[in-house]
């Protein structure tokens, strides 16, 4: 087996074991409300501006590009349906995850790495504490709470941005029928 695949599989296994440890810890001990709320602010509230700015411009660009593509077929009135579906199903969750991971992931990695270098994680273990419980579980729970809320807001703001462009620049004020589920 090539070395790179072996490294990937070992890393993936380590992540899965860590998630199992986090699940066991949350089930048996719960999480610290103070730490979790602090990380919700860091992960969710402080990521809100970059996520919403990205979403509104994505909705605007998506509306313009969709309108120009559909204009050739005389289906310009379906811009709203397509923008809404694209943002709700694909772009909203993906762009939110990319923005949050880019902003928060580097900070969390740097913070925990700094704690490893200064031996703070070893100090937690030496004092009888569990680093998973103190450092990892609150961050994972905060992410599980923050990311769906950020995604919902991103979808709504992206659709509003697309609607603003559709009404002001594309002169689309037609209210279309709801899209049928597939």
What are these regions, as identified by a protein language model?
Residues 27-53:
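Membrane-interface helix starts
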């Amino acid at each position: 087996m090539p070395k790179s695949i072996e490294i990937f599989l070992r890393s993936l296994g380590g992540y899965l074991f860590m998630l199992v440890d986090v699940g066991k810890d949350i089930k048996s001990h719960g999480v610290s409300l103070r730490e979790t709320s602090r990380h919700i602010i860091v992960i969710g509230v402080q990521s809100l501006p970059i996520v919403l700015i990205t979403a509104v411009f994505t909705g605007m660009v998506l509306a313009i590009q969709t309108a120009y593509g559909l204009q050739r077929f005389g289906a310009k009135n379906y811009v709203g349906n397509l923008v809404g579906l694209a943002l709700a199903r694909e772009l909203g969750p993906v762009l939110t995850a990319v923005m949050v991971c880019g902003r928060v992931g580097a900070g969390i990695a740097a913070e925990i790495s700094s704690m490893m270098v200064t031996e703070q994680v070893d100090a937690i273990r030496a004092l009888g504490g569990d680093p998973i419980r103190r450092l990892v579980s609150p961050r994972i729970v905060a992410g599980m709470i923050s990311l769906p809320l950020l995604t919902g807001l991103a979808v709504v703001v992206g659709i509003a941005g697309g609607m603003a462009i559709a009404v002001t620049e594309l002169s689309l004020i037609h209210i279309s029928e709801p899209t049928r589920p597939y």
